[in-house]
C-alpha cells in the first residue's frame, strides 16, 4: 500500500463582476455580519457584499425548489456566504493525490478476510445507528482557515475506538497530527491525508490529547511529548469500496474515517435533509467521520442517509453534522476511502 492511493486532503468561488447592490438586503447583510463577526475594509466590503448577495439568491432559489419537491435538502446562509466557490476551495478543500486503481484492487483482496460476506449481513444490521448516543463521539470542532480536515476524522475514529476499549472519551490532538506527521507525507495546514495520519500515530507510538496539545489553526513545530500520550493504535483497516461493507463497519466497529467529494456551491451551505448532489463524482477532496446511518420517512422512501461529522463548527449543517445520501451508488464517494483504527 502507498499513500498515493489515499485521499489527500486540503481542507474548502469566481470573482464576481461589478453589479448594483440589492438595497432590500441591507438589514439582512448587517445582521449576518454581526452574527458571524465579519469586519471588512471599505473596498473589501463592496466585493464581499456582491459575493454574499449572489450566494443568498442561489440559496433562496434552491430552497424554493425544495419546497416544490425538486431536491431533498435545504441550504442556509452561513459563515461561508461571503466567499466565492474558488475562495472556499482554496481555504477548506484543495488538492488530491492521484488514485491508482491497481493498488486499490490489491487492498480489496488483502482486506477480504476482514469482512467475509459482510455484504450478505445487511438484513441483520440495525436500521439506525448513531454513535453519539453511545458516548463514542466528542464535540464538533472547527478547522478554520487551516486545511486540516484530514486530521479531524482520524482523531475522531481513534477517540471512538479508545472509548470502546476503556470507557473514557478523551478528545485527541488534531494539532499533534498537523505539526508532527510531515515525515509521513502530510503538509500541515497545506494538505494531508488520513492514511499518513494513521501511519504517524501507529509508528509514533501514541497521540496526545487536545488538553495537552491544543488546536491552533496553524502549523507549528512538533512538540509531541510521549509522557502526555493519551491514545495508541495497533494498526488500521482500509475498507473495500462498498457501502455495504461501510454499513457493516459503522454498525459493528464504531465511527469510521472517510472521504467525500465536496461540491462547494451546495455542500458548504447545507442546512438539513438528506444531501444528494447530482454533480458529485468520485473525486474525493474532503475528509469526514461517519458516526451513523438511518433513513428519513419510511424505509422504502429511498431517503437513506449516512450521518457524518464535519469539522466546520456547530453553526454548519445539523450543528456540525450532515445526512448524506446512502445506497445511491456510493454517492459523493462516501465509501471510497473509509478507514478505522485498531487499538
Curated annotation (Swiss-Prot):
GO terms for biological process: proteolysis involved in protein catabolic process. It is found in: Lysosome. InterPro entries: Papain-like_cys_pep_sf (IPR038765), Pept_asp_AS (IPR025661), Pept_his_AS (IPR025660), Peptidase_C1A (IPR013128), Peptidase_C1A_C (IPR000668), Peptidase_C1A_papain-like (IPR039417), Prot_inhib_I29 (IPR013201). Keywords: Disulfide bond, Glycoprotein, Hydrolase, Lysosome, Protease, Signal, Thiol protease, Zymogen. The keyword Glycoprotein applies. Pfam families: Inhibitor_I29, Peptidase_C1. Glycans are attached at residues 228, 298. Residues 21-124 form a propeptide. Highly expressed in placenta. Transmembrane segments: none annotated. Gene3D superfamilies: 1.10.287.2250, Cysteine proteinases. The active site is at 149, 286, 310. Disulfide bonds join 146-189, 180-222, 280-332. Residues 1-20 form the signal peptide. GO terms for molecular function: cysteine-type endopeptidase activity. Its EC number is 3.4.22.-. GO terms for cellular component: extracellular space; lysosome. PANTHER family: CYSTEINE PROTEASE FAMILY C1-RELATED. Belongs to the peptidase C1 family. This is Cathepsin Q.
